[in-house]
């Protein structure tokens, strides 16, 4: 899976200055890590004297990106991999200078990487992994009967399901797009056998996933 680091995206000339000082609208996606980074932004901006509003768990990438472009929010945390694979998809952009230039052309600024990262992984329940002797992605080739439930963004990304399927020659045909939270519930209930994970998800330990 592709390495994915965090950075911050903001609308250039964002923030409003009122009688009591600047105001900043922070956005975050619908999962814990994004909300936590959003809260860090809130505390940082507040400590600088700004009046800050945090719009938590707004949704997925497109919702946050469109909100940023329209000025509904001023800043939000984003994955560098998501920027290249979704927001700037098809442009052949990879390096940070190229990413920054392409975003600047749309009036969007980007911070330096925040110094930590997250990656996609495939998760299955530990007992199923033991029974089927699955320890790595290539082992899935031997089990075409497995049912996959992936986040909708993962289903569409070039480095998501399409790239994973082609790279490993995965034969599974029962593959559906789900909300990330619903996929965890589906895995627990037995409706699906495998899902995409963020490697920092607390649910990995909670649900005893491999």
Please tell me what each predicted stretch does.
Residues 41-49, 137-176:
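Ligand-binding cleft/hinge of the Venus flytrap
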Residues 79-99, 185-210:
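A ligand-binding cleft/hinge motif common to bilobed small-molecule-binding domains
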């Amino acid at each position: 899976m592709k390495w994915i680091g965090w950075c911050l995206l903001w609308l250039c000339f964002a923030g409003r200055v009122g009688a009591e000082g600047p105001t900043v609208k922070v956005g975050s996606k619908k999962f814990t890590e994004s909300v936590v980074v959003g809260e860090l932004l809130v505390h940082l901006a507040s400590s600088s004297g700004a009046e800050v509003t945090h719009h938590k768990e707004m949704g997925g990438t497109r919702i946050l990106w469109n909100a940023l472009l329209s000025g509904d929010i001023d800043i939000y945390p984003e994955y560098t991999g998501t920027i290249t694979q979704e927001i700037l998809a098809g442009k052949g952009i990879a390096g940070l200078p190229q990413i920054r230039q392409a975003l600047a052309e749309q009036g969007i600024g980007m911070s330096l990487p925040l110094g930590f990262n997250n990656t996609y992984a495939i998760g299955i329940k530990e007992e199923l992994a033991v029974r089927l002797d699955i320890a790595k992605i290539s082992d899935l080739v031997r089990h075409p009967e497995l049912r996959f439930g992936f986040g909708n963004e993962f289903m569409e990304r070039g480095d998501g399901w399409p790239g994973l399927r082609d790279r490993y020659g995965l034969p599974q045909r029962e593959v559906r797009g789900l909300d990330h939270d619903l996929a965890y519930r589906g895995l627990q209930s037995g409706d699906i056998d495998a899902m995409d994970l963020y490697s920092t998800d607390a649910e990995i330990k909670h649900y005893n996933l491999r």
